[in-house]
């Protein structure tokens, strides 16, 4: 029986088990008795060749797991058996059936998908570092190519099974369909895991690439931070920063009148202050070499600050002296008054709190007396009117007293 469905795009419109020059009906499903007449019959070698050409797996089936695995090779066919016809003595062959081809290819694909799933599991467990992610991406691409080849083999096997099911018994096709569905579901699960791992690796690669580019940018910036011809700041150096010559010697830390290179300098006193009378250093004298202009500016700044400090100190001293002078001026008069008065009399300053306490005590007594005198001044006539009346209920019996 001929299968009308093609295996895949590579085989074109050629039927499944009919290569060019192969017979259409004979030597496919079962054995036929060859008559004793002079008709041509195929030899065992030709039958085996035709069986492999017609029922062997197509080009899609050749992309299985690489290595020494048996699944990588096309299924091996058993040697066709022959027997002698008692009537004519001619030999007839038993070529392998399409169901056996389908089972062999299904086993091969199952082993291939198991190997791909194991490789995918190893890739999933080996993530976590940039170098591992890079190598994992390369391995994932190779795994994806192998998985696509296996998927094409599964598609070709499903098409072959559908064509075989149209010419087989319903019971045999039910078991075959269940096997093929399980194989397709396993292929789809591997594809889903592959896509998830690919998305994870892409995200890892993006993150690690950004981190690496950031590290490289920082390294380049760190290399470019070394002082160039324009100094540390380069062409953007601000004009207010001191130069290297200004930083060689600090006039404020001058000890013993030494200059920038250990030169002895002389100090000249300036004009005395009008308030404090002290003379501050007006400027630096001339030593072996003249001082720099920045040094004279620093001296002027120091002299101005010193003058302000002396002026503030003089103002504080003057403010402190004024109340002390007032106390000193008032103390002789107080002593004279105390001497003129009676030595046994108390001090008038001590009498003020006593009079205040006495006034408070008298006010308290007045309030207490008013509290006791106000209720008694009203009289007995007014007392009854001020007492509040309590409400009461009067019961009157219309028909007499109630029965006892």
Curated annotation (Swiss-Prot):
GO cellular component, one term: meiotic nuclear membrane microtubule tethering complex
Recorded topology in the membrane: Single-pass type IV membrane protein
Cytoplasmic side: 1-355
UniProt function note: As a component of the LINC (LInker of Nucleoskeleton and Cytoskeleton) complex, involved in the connection between the nuclear lamina and the cytoskeleton. The nucleocytoplasmic interactions established by the LINC complex play an important role in the transmission of mechanical forces across the nuclear envelope and in nuclear movement and positioning. Behaves as a kinesin cargo, providing a functional binding site for kinesin-1 at the nuclear envelope.
Species classification: Eukaryota, Metazoa, Chordata, Craniata, Vertebrata
Compositional bias annotation for Polar residues: 39-52
Illness: Deafness, autosomal recessive, 76: A form of non-syndromic sensorineural deafness, a disorder resulting from damage to the neural receptors of the inner ear, the nerve pathways to the brain, or the area of the brain that receives sound information. DFNB76 affected individuals have onset of progressive high frequency hearing impairment between birth and 6 years of age. The hearing loss is severe at high frequencies by adulthood.
Transmembrane parts of this sequence: 356-376
Annotated keywords: Deafness, Disulfide bond, Membrane, Non-syndromic deafness, Nucleus, Transmembrane, Transmembrane helix
Matching PROSITE patterns: KASH (PS51049)
Similarity section: Belongs to the nesprin family.
Signal sequence, start to end: none
Biased composition (Basic residues): 307-320
Perinuclear space side stretches: 377-404
Ranges where the record places region Disordered: 1-91, 277-347
Domains (record comment): The KASH domain, which contains a transmembrane domain, mediates the nuclear envelope targeting and is involved in the binding to SUN1 and SUN2 through recognition of their SUN domains.
Stated name of the protein: Nesprin-4
Localization per record: Nucleus outer membrane
InterPro entries: KASH, SYNE4
Segments forming domain KASH: 347-404
């Amino acid at each position: 029986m001929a299968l009308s469905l093609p295996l895949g795009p590579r085989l074109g419109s050629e039927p499944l088990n009919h290569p060019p020059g192969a017979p259409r009906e004979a030597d496919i499903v079962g054995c036929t008795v060859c008559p004793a007449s002079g008709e041509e019959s195929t030899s065992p070698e030709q039958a085996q060749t035709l069986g492999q050409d017609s029922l062997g797996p197509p080009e899609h089936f050749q992309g299985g797991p690489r290595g020494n695995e048996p699944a990588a090779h096309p299924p091996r066919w058993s040697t066709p058996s022959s027997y002698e016809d008692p009537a004519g003595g001619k030999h007839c062959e038993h070529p392998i059936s399409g169901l056996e081809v389908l089972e062999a290819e299904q086993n091969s694909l199952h082993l291939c998908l198991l190997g791909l799933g194991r490789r995918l599991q190893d890739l999933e467990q080996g993530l976590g570092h940039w170098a591992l992610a890079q190598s994992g991406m390369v391995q994932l691409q190779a795994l994806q190519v192998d998985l696509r080849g296996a998927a094409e083999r599964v598609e070709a096997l499903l098409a072959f099974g559908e064509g075989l099911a149209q010419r087989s018994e319903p019971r045999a096709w039910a078991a075959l369909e269940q096997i093929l569905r399980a194989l397709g579901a396993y292929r789809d699960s591997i594809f889903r895991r592959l896509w998830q791992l690919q998305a994870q690796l892409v995200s890892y690669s993006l993150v690690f690439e950004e981190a690496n580019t950031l590290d490289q940018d920082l390294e380049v910036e760190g290399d470019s931070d070394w002082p160039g011809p324009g100094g540390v700041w380069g062409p953007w150096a601000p004009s207010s920063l001191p130069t290297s010559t200004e930083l060689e010697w600090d006039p404020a830390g001058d000890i013993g009148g030494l200059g920038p290179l250990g030169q002895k300098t002389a100090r000249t006193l300036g004009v005395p202050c009008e308030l404090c009378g002290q003379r501050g250093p007006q400027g630096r004298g001339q030593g072996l070499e003249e001082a720099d202009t920045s040094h004279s500016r620093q001296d002027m700044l120091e002299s101005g600050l010193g003058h302000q400090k002396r002026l503030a100190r003089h103002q504080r001293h003057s403010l402190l002296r004024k109340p002390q002078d007032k106390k000193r001026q008032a103390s002789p008069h107080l002593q004279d008054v105390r001497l003129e008065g009676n030595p046994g009399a108390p001090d008038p300053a001590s009498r003020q709190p006593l009079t205040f306490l006495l006034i408070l005590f008298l006010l308290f007594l007045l309030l207490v007396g008013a509290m006791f005198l106000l209720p008694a001044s009203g009289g007995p006539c007014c007392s009854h009117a001020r007492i509040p009346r309590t409400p009461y209920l009067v019961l009157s019996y219309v028909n007499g007293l109630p029965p006892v």
